[in-house]
């Protein structure tokens, strides 16, 4: 695993079997390929990463990733969330890493340009501890549902708040609303700090762990993207939506 030792920009795809909403989700088939394989192959197309690896504590997922030719690392079962799984892999296997991208395994339609944009934004903003992506939306369902996280940020691209509520509230002046895309780029040193930040009142209220960063006064910058992602997979019925989306993309390319 020479790439592990020398990689400076690393993409980690945490993958777990026991999703309460969709057990076994990583191995669900989408037009003949599993969710984890599609997510992994998308990440491999990034121009900015030196190495991409799946991190899992499940032998079935590990065996499958190895079978399709991907890189995979087994992690401990004590990780409380995907970010802790990412940090464990980086601290153990990537001594030279400088930038770490946490790639969500439920975004099979994520464009690799999103990953490249995250890395570029982090490199170009020395004050940023971490970077995440957002995209503008006018979809009323996405705006109103608490399953989609919204974000507001300042003129310099620094996040002010994340919420499951519709923010900002357009009471008197129409303002763009941005949906959060759950992909993060960290400086390695800050990632080690991040996993040690205790839950905060706002992070518990919203059930959004990134709010811990804002509550202690650290900075999250945002990278605004357009048309760079499709439907995500949260429930079994989302598989059909993703397949329809991919088929439409395939037809449009001809």
UniProtKB/Swiss-Prot annotation:
It catalyses: 3-deoxy-alpha-D-manno-oct-2-ulosonate + CTP = CMP-3-deoxy-beta-D-manno-octulosonate + diphosphate. It comes from the Bacteria. Coiled coil: none annotated. The keyword Nucleotidyltransferase applies. GO terms for molecular function: 3-deoxy-manno-octulosonate cytidylyltransferase activity. Belongs to the KdsB family. This is 3-deoxy-manno-octulosonate cytidylyltransferase. The lineage of its organism: Bacteria, Pseudomonadati, Chlamydiota, Chlamydiia, Chlamydiales. The gene is kdsB.
